[in-house]
């Protein structure tokens, strides 16, 4: 069996169907002793460019070990499902189990101006204009 990384994008209006789709697709991959190593639901995200006049899509990532027949069946299921906007199946050398960069926590960066309340900034601005006059 080979290792695969699978990403698919679902129409945003059909986001409530995603858990059922994930269950159906993981069942296909687990046929003949396949195994899912990583499953991440990235949720609705902004698209880099519009697809079918849509600007958002629901993303799902699966890393699995499966047979070629199971992957062919999965690709066939993607092809005939109108809710799937795009999909990508890549073969990888090893199983990937650590969280993807999309799922890792990012510290929120604050703008430098936002650290001071607006009123204090306004007071400082009036003080500097008075000093210059």
From Swiss-Prot:
Entry GO terms, CC: cytosolic small ribosomal subunit
Recorded family membership: Belongs to the bacterial ribosomal protein bS6 family.
Region (Disordered) location: 93-133
PANTHER family, per the entry: MITOCHONDRIAL 28S RIBOSOMAL PROTEIN S6, SMALL RIBOSOMAL SUBUNIT PROTEIN BS6M
InterPro entries associated with the record: Ribosomal_bS6, Ribosomal_bS6_sf, Ribosomal_S6_plastid/chlpt, Transl_elong_EF1B/ribsomal_bS6
Protein keywords: Ribonucleoprotein, Ribosomal protein, RNA-binding, rRNA-binding
Residues annotated as transmembrane: none
Molecular function as annotated in GO: small ribosomal subunit rRNA binding; structural constituent of ribosome
Matching CDD domains: bS6
The keyword Ribonucleoprotein belongs to this UniProt entry's keyword annotation: yes
Protein name from the UniProt record: Small ribosomal subunit protein bS6
GO biological process: translation
Ranges annotated as biased composition (Basic and acidic residues): 103-133
